Amino acid sequence: MPKMFGTDGVRGLANRDLTARLALDLGDAAVRVLGDAGTQDDQPEGRRRALVGRDTRVSGDFLASALSAGMSAGGFDVIDAGIIPTPGVAYLTSVLNVEIGAVISASHNPMPDNGIKFFARGGFKLPDQKEDDIEAVLGQDWDRPTGAGVGRVSHDQTTATNLYIDHLVATIAPLNDDKTQPKPLKGLKIVADCANGATSVVAPEALRRAGADVIVINASPDGYNINKNAGSTHPEQLQAMVKATDAVMGVAFDGDADRCLAVDEDGNMINGDQIMGILARAKQREGKLNHDTLVVTVMSNLGLKLALKDMGIKTVETAVGDRYVLEEMLKGGYSLGGEQSGHVINREFATTGDGTLTALTLCNEVVKSGKSLKELAADFPQLPQTLINVPNVDKKAAATNKRIQDAVAREEELLGDTGRVLLRPSGTEPLVRVMAEAATQAYADEVCTRLAKIVAEELAL
């Protein structure tokens, strides 16, 4: 039986794969497994609590109701925070000291999909073992509470949203002694593309409260338009709007706002690697880059690593996935990490990737440095990269096939320190991703094509 939990919770087509019954069962199983993490006495009035948030997908309504029903039937009082970014749920799980945080979202996936993921007390994503434990008791009968032992469900989106926005703004603009709010982004004209998703209220408000002049696009969610030709996966509108309005820069979020990409004044995309480079250098300057190290994944561009090396900043690599980045950060005591896709984890303020936090800190660095985003990003040039997916192959054999490994070694020797190659099996499909980086796009294409041909010949099913 395949695992239900993937790299980012349970996902699938809403009402087909991810049904109300499954959401109910997940809520029921989660309180059994995660409820053991605390005691009744450490919560107000002796009640255990959970918090549920969701993105703007229409299916989020019935899934939130079902998930909350499962948890309240298990004896937990549930706070329904309504539509709120995923990192907002993580933050509130920590600051409100609830035992379980739950998010209903499929992030950057199309609208018909949805997902459920959990945060443990403290706002951290669950380790694999806890997800396995939830899956193991899914749908089982147990001695559920009755009478006064069952939980209540309360709805308070306004309070939850305001607490989160206050936190975000305070990361770059802590209140003055007289309780007035500084405006560090005053005069900064930016465009924010909210993907018609969970940060449609949060990001514009946080940026404005920090002083920015914000032009907002794709912030009118109707339940059906999340990520539709908008946000970080479709930045064309943002690029055009930045140029049309003479904005200094633009920021784009995905549906649940755990990632952020940017656009410079000329409409050029600034990816997660470049954003991480800019923020790592800023933290180093302020003495806040722990161990002078940035945590990245194997997909981060070699150009980033070479540029950081020249600045005296080390990099530590992990597997692809923000959960693996966070694991390494916690293990090594690092303060900043992330992915090329725009997941950036700033442990000074967050326990997970936070797109709105990334946007605020990036805008703040533009102001503090006195440079444009284009100038800042130019210090982190990206090597040309080519990626080819080779389908219908025995992906597990790629690491042991002699001809493939010999070919990889040969290409790496030829590239030296001017490029690299990477073979990565897909986690969900019978395919191998072949990636090459080189000094020129033509050479990257050439290397990638050669290797992809050998992979197809050797591993064909």
UniProtKB/Swiss-Prot annotation:
The active site is at S107 (phosphoserine intermediate). GO terms for molecular function: magnesium ion binding; phosphoglucosamine mutase activity; phosphomannomutase activity. It comes from the Bacteria. The modification Phosphoserine is found at S107. Activated by phosphorylation. Mg(2+) binds at S107, D254, D256, D258. It holds the Pfam family PGM_PMM_II. GO terms for biological process: carbohydrate metabolic process; peptidoglycan biosynthetic process; UDP-N-acetylglucosamine biosynthetic process. It is an enzyme of class 5 (isomerase). Binds 1 Mg(2+) ion per subunit. It catalyses: alpha-D-glucosamine 1-phosphate = D-glucosamine 6-phosphate. InterPro entries: A-D-PHexomutase_a/b/a-I, A-D-PHexomutase_a/b/a-I/II/III, A-D-PHexomutase_a/b/a-II, A-D-PHexomutase_a/b/a-III, A-D-PHexomutase_C, A-D-PHexomutase_C_sf, Alpha-D-phosphohexomutase_SF, GlmM_bact. Keywords: Isomerase, Magnesium, Metal-binding, Phosphoprotein. Its cofactor is Mg(2+). Belongs to the phosphohexose mutase family. Catalyzes the conversion of glucosamine-6-phosphate to glucosamine-1-phosphate. NCBIfam families: glmM (TIGR01455). This is Phosphoglucosamine mutase. The lineage of its organism: Bacteria, Bacillati, Actinomycetota, Actinomycetes, Bifidobacteriales.
